[in-house]
Amino acid sequence: SAASDVYKRQSVNGFIKIYDPENNQIFVNKRNAIHYENMSYALAESLSNSGQGWIHEINFGNGGTSIDPTGIITYLTPNNTGVNASLYNQTFTKIIDDRSISNTDPVRNKTEVRHVSGTNYTDLIVSCLLDYGEPSGQDAFDTTTDANSLYVFDELGLRSWNPAGTGNLLTHVVFHPVQKSLNRLIQIDYTVRVQSLSGLTGE
């Protein structure tokens, strides 16, 4: 129903910005799809102090688009249904939980909660930096013509943590292909806005 749709769109929203922090070139700046089933479960797990459910990593992939011989790009629909949803073709993962011992750079790969007193929404800011040397095996320069190269990313998503190491996909965004290569940094600023359902403001 329309009311149900409004509920889903307004309770949790996602926004993503992907750019080169050296020259501020913006590659992606858009909303993204929320996996409402998995997100609701993760929120409940976190609130209940169950020891799992928080955002742990960003998954990167190269299966979100297809390009025909004339250069026309087709964007696939984000995977935001089914508890076992995943990226179309995951090729890299970066841990952004700054409390995790597996996070190799918690200063630049972290989560932060931002709230302004008196408002009915709170932002969770996820920061992720792909440094010059990562991922291992990338091309030296961002000049590839192969859109299916492992590190030409066109999709990414936030994933939660659980003890089995098989956390759930919480968000999924598909975008114009962006190559990660040795000659460039890529910064991802990912905002998840959690908003109450009364007095919907702050859009």
Per-segment meaning from a language model:
Residues S4, K8-F153, W161-E203:
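Small cysteine-rich, disulfide-bonded extracellular modules of the LU/uPAR three-finger superfamily
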